[in-house]
Amino acid sequence: MATHEEFIRTQVFGTVFEITNRYTDLNPVGMGAFGLVCSATDTLAGQPVAIKKIMKPFSTAVLAKRTYRELKLLKHLRHENLICLQDIFLSPLEDIYFVTELQGTDLHRLLQTRPLEKQFVQYFLYQILRGLKYVHSAGVIHRDLKPSNILINENCDLKICDFGLARIQDPQMTGYVSTRYYRAPEIMLTWQKYDVEVDIWSAGCIFSEMIEGKPLFPGKVHVHQFSIITDLLGSPPRDVIITICSEDTLKFVTSLPHRDPVPFQERFKAVEPDAVDLLGRMLVFDPKKRITAADALVHPYLAPYHDPTDEPIAEAQFDWDFNDADLPVDTWRVMMYSEILDFHKIGGSDGQIDTNAAFDDQVAAATAGPMLPLWLNSNININNSHPVNIQVQLLRHQQPRITVVYQ
């Protein structure tokens, strides 16, 4: 049906936040490299929400693709321990806003306030691994797991967020961005070859930080980070060294003096044996020998929470077909509009598209009102069922005009 919502423009930390009047009581809660997050009240649902502004998503093809990837992932990944997308809209200034559940805090802030008791460490780790089991089963690697990306509410319910850097499970990765403290050693050594095990390493670093109240590997720079990892784990084994792609990296690693590993039981003397054992299985140099999320869930340390009937996997693998595409901004824009329309369920349950007058109103609601002047013409897929050709004329201060042709 048609929308009667209007946009309201507000300044937050010097940034224009342009949202519909459905959302009120804006308060900034976080700022990242790609967007600003505010808490708000959803007056329609009567509940608090978090609104993430993606600034200038169509300024470059790289940013457009990144935003499209995050939106696709948020739509596909639906799990109790992952942040859930509740709404998405495009503002008149062409910024994109993701609306999700509001959690009270994040693990980074929680760790700064007080030490965690054993039962909280167990419960939080269990939820992290439960979420990772699902994510990995969908063929997705988070790639940037860290305490600030782990949200927690007053009931201690935990949700993993920020899938903007997530990637396909592929042994030949290109490029990597993460917070240094939680970065797996294979990233530093091989750069282009990594898999879901990088998330297990990050989770292990977070596990240790929850136990001790401080980062386990607080590297100051890349080389220092690797050095303090070897202080605990010893020199990398031959199976890891032979995977190093860079000649300079190989020369650096082989030039280092040999270091023996420190037994985890000695390093974590005050920690219960089951916790030390699980930590030792997560923080292993060789990713092939690192424990999986599914296996970690059945470890004795997590026995108080483990429930094999309530640790689901994804129903389907995430479709990464778009990921290698090198497309212009306008094409990413069309694809983004398609995903927004799909999210707002323009099509019926059978995937058919309603082309009557009400459809135009629904399109206007989904794309959130006036747009920049632009002709878009592209083959896209609505509801992943009927291939269609959609011609969209978006005119400032006018309803979008849509022509739908079934192929």
Curated annotation (Swiss-Prot):
The modification Phosphotyrosine is found at residue 176. One of its GO terms (molecular function) is MAP kinase activity. The modification Phosphothreonine is found at residue 174. Its cofactor is Mg(2+). SMART domains: S_TKc. One of its GO terms (biological process) is stress-activated MAPK cascade. The active site is at 144 (proton acceptor). Signal peptide: none annotated. Residues 23-302 form the Protein kinase domain. It catalyses: L-seryl-[protein] + ATP = O-phospho-L-seryl-[protein] + ADP + H(+); L-threonyl-[protein] + ATP = O-phospho-L-threonyl-[protein] + ADP + H(+). Pfam families: Pkinase. Its main location: cytoplasm. PROSITE patterns: MAPK, PROTEIN_KINASE_ATP, PROTEIN_KINASE_DOM, PROTEIN_KINASE_ST. The keyword Nucleus applies. Activated by tyrosine and threonine phosphorylation. It is an enzyme of class 2 (transferase). Its EC number is 2.7.11.24. ATP binds at residues 29-37, 52. Dually phosphorylated on Thr-174 and Tyr-176, which activates the enzyme. InterPro entries: Kinase-like_dom_sf, MAP_kinase, MAP_kinase_CS, MAPK_p38-like, MAPK_Sty1/Hog1, Prot_kinase_dom, Protein_kinase_ATP_BS, Ser/Thr_kinase_AS. It comes from the Eukaryota. Transmembrane segments: none annotated. Belongs to the protein kinase superfamily. Ser/Thr protein kinase family. MAP kinase subfamily. HOG1 sub-subfamily. The TXY motif contains the threonine and tyrosine residues whose phosphorylation activates the MAP kinases. This is Mitogen-activated protein kinase HOG1.
